[in-house]
């Protein structure tokens, strides 16, 4: 065989092996995912009342959506919860909207330049410090030690299932668990593009994440 024949031969078999590995890995994830789900169904629901649920909502110019976001989180079924909105240097009416919907369950962390608008990670880190130093020091929350405080990160346009704490809390009964990734759905699947995006999240969460959970190797995703 000539040089080009050998090159085509190598490319063909490398591609064949890669495809075979991909299909095999998909089947393995499907099998392990089903085993994990069966094991999970046998696990009793957790007691969400044991925990303080702290929902962190990064917000930059979310004046149109932030009131609805807070209302949705207020509808989440958690006995002990606090909603922390991080107003990350907004120059619209986000701050005014938050002032109008205040309550004992809502805390607002207002960031201003030069610290504001330095990225979502920086905003969340500031919120963690704010919760630790100020919120957990309040008499209403001093009964919760750090092992019984669960942070939930929710985008301003996100929707968390009302019964999520009941399902999530059972995972934290295992002290080796440090975080839980919930399944993500696209709720406005009104176009072909958003429908395909929803399918992507379904495959990623329902196959890859669940399959990896069997070995305890699932990871936290986000933007």
Predicted regions and their residues:
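N-terminal membrane-anchoring/stem segments of glycan-assembly enzymes
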Residues: 1-49, 209
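Cell-envelope/extracellular polymer assembly enzymes that use nucleotide-activated donors
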Residues: 51-54, 82
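Donor nucleotide-sugar binding loop of glycosyltransferases
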Residues: 62-65, 90
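Acidic helix N-cap motif at the loop->helix transition within catalytic regions
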Residues: 67, 92-100, 120, 163
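Short, acidic, metal-binding catalytic loop of nucleotide-sugar glycosyltransferases
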Residues: 71-80
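A conserved acidic beta->alpha catalytic loop
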Residues: 87-96, 111-116, 159
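Long helical/loop segments within the catalytic core of UDP-sugar-dependent glycosyltransferases
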Residues: 110-113, 117-146, 162-223
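Short aromatic/hydrophobic "clamp" motif used to bind/position activated sugar donors
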Residues: 151
């Amino acid at each position: 065989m000539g040089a080009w024949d050998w090159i085509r031969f190598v490319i063909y078999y490398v591609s064949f092996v890669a495809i075979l590995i991909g299909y095999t890995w998909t089947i393995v994830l499907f099998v392990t995912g089903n085993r994990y789900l069966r094991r999970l169904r046998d696990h009793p629901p957790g007691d969400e009342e044991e925990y303080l649920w702290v929902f962190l909502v990064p917000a930059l110019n979310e004046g149109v959506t932030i009131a609805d976001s807070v209302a949705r989180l207020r509808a989440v079924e958690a006995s002990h919860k606090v909603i922390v909105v991080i107003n990350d240097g907004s120059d619209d009416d986000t701050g005014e909207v938050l002032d109008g919907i205040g309550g004992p369950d809502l805390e607002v962390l207002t960031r201003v330049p030069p610290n504001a608008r330095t990225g979502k990670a920086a905003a969340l880190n500031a919120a963690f410090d704010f919760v630790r130093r100020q919120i957990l020091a309040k008499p209403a929350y001093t009964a919760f030690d750090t092992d019984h405080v669960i942070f939930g990160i929710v985008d301003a346009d996100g929707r968390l299932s009302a019964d999520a704490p009941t399902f999530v809390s059972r995972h934290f009964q295992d002290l080796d668990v440090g975080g839980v990734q919930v399944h993500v759905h696209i709720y406005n699947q009104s176009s072909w593009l958003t429908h395909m995006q929803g399918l992507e999240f379904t495959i990623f969460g329902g196959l890859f994440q669940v399959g990896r959970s069997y070995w305890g190797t699932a990871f936290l995703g986000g933007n």
